[in-house]
Amino acid sequence: MLSEQTRSLVKATVPVLQQHGVALTSHFYRRMFEHNPELKNVFNQGHQHSGQQQQALAMAVLAYARHIDDPSPLLPVLTRVAHKHVSLGIRAEHYPIVGKHLLASIRELLGEAAGDDLIQAWAEAYGLLADTLIGIENGMYGDATSADGGWSGWRPFRVAKKEIESEEIASFYLEPSDGGALPAFKPGQYVSVKRFVAEWGLSQPRQYSLSDAPNGEYLRISVKREDAAQGKPAGRVSNLLHREVQVGDVLELSAPQGDFFLHEERDGPAVLISAGVGQTPMQAMLGQLLKRGGREVRFLHAARHGGAHAMGAKVRQLADRHPQLKVHVCYETPRAQDAIGVDYQAAGRLNLADVKGIALLPDADYYLCGPLGFMRAQRDSLRGLGVAADRIHYEVFGSHPGDD
């Protein structure tokens, strides 16, 4: 428990964090990587170069300072962070390194304003946060290790099959190199994949949703090749996977993690809403729902056009075999060869108000995944159509769709 004085000192830094938070976290990462360069193999260097990670950490530090009197509302966020940490192999021994450089960065940036009392207050606050995360993560590591077919750390997998799904998405079917069992993960979860990037001289982890239901034979990831666009550099790891990785190659994987997953204990309808590569966790959910049977399923998907639409034929075949599955696909800019009524059902952007007859079902759970703008629009649309907040489950690849 933090003292009132400690909490007051931490809260007093909120205005500074609002104004200079990104400067602080940018300085922190530069400092930490200079003194502990081995950690570059743990952190996504693409996010470092884009500034995305610095921005995310600045927002997290600010949120913690604002909630220092009662951090309990942050528990869902901390749980999400812990899942990510476990997938990256972050352990208790990493926290003192982070704390050392965070406190040093506060002192170096604030100068005389960062007196000993303030540094001590933040040391205590960081210690409490670290202990909380370590406790959550230790539980997750234990669960991953004790599960049938589970493991901790990195496990080698052989690429048994590589399948081109669209102009920009490829699927990799991965079998354990050790011939061992696989865990019954929760559909919607992800794994971290580690690949050496020669250009940087670093191993780099990336998170990819598992795109097929648990089957005991393989894990499947479906990776979008991130091309350079609008000043944004190409994705190093996704391009390496597309260009270099072939059948027979070996990839290192973490055990499945993530707090976005299908609620299998419920028996009402499930409505899966996605855009682009955001359909990958939905594919795992869809496969599991149809395998188990007994629930109405809706699969709503938005793509730019048929060339970018992955797994469309597979979903159509599933709909032909399973009458409880209804599919609605929107192409924003369909090509001449894209057949309406076959490849897609509507042109333009997905508007749930236009498909209420398909999408709105009593007692349904709604699962959303896609780009941030898409996510906010679908979430707001569902709320406007009367869907309760606790029936909407979502995952954004990148940022969280919270209010600005």
Curated annotation (Swiss-Prot):
Residue ranges occupied by any Globin domain in the UniProt entry: 1-138
Residues that hold FAD according to the record: Y190, R206, Q207, Y208, S209, V396, F397, G398, S399
Family named by the database record: Belongs to the globin family. Two-domain flavohemoproteins subfamily.
Cofactor-binding details, from the entry: Binds 1 heme b (iron(II)-protoporphyrin IX) group per subunit.
Enzyme Commission code(s) on record: 1.14.12.17
Binding site for heme b: H85
Chain positions recorded as NADP(+) binding sites: G276, V277, G278, Q279, T280, P281
InterPro entries noted in UniProt: Cbr1-like_FAD-bd_dom (IPR008333), FAD-bd_FR_type (IPR017927), FNR_nucleotide-bd (IPR039261), Globin (IPR000971), Globin-like_sf (IPR009050), Globin/Proto (IPR012292), Hmp (IPR023950), OxRdtase_FAD/NAD-bd (IPR001433)
Site residues, Influences the redox potential of the prosthetic heme and FAD groups: K84, E395
Reaction(s) this enzyme catalyzes, per UniProt: 2 nitric oxide + NADPH + 2 O2 = 2 nitrate + NADP(+) + H(+); 2 nitric oxide + NADH + 2 O2 = 2 nitrate + NAD(+) + H(+)
Active-site feature positions: Y95, E137
GO biological process: cellular response to nitrosative stress; nitric oxide catabolic process; response to toxic substance
Domain notes: Consists of two distinct domains; an N-terminal heme-containing oxygen-binding domain and a C-terminal reductase domain with binding sites for FAD and NAD(P)H.
Swiss-Prot/TrEMBL site (Involved in heme-bound ligand stabilization and O-O bond activation) positions: Y29
Protein name: Flavohemoprotein
Keyword field contains DNA-binding: no
Cofactors named for this entry: heme b; FAD
Stated role: Is involved in NO detoxification in an aerobic process, termed nitric oxide dioxygenase (NOD) reaction that utilizes O(2) and NAD(P)H to convert NO to nitrate, which protects the bacterium from various noxious nitrogen compounds. Therefore, plays a central role in the inducible response to nitrosative stress.
Source species, domain of life: Bacteria
Keywords: Detoxification, FAD, Flavoprotein, Heme, Iron, Metal-binding, NAD, NADP, Oxidoreductase, Oxygen transport, Transport
HAMAP family: Hmp
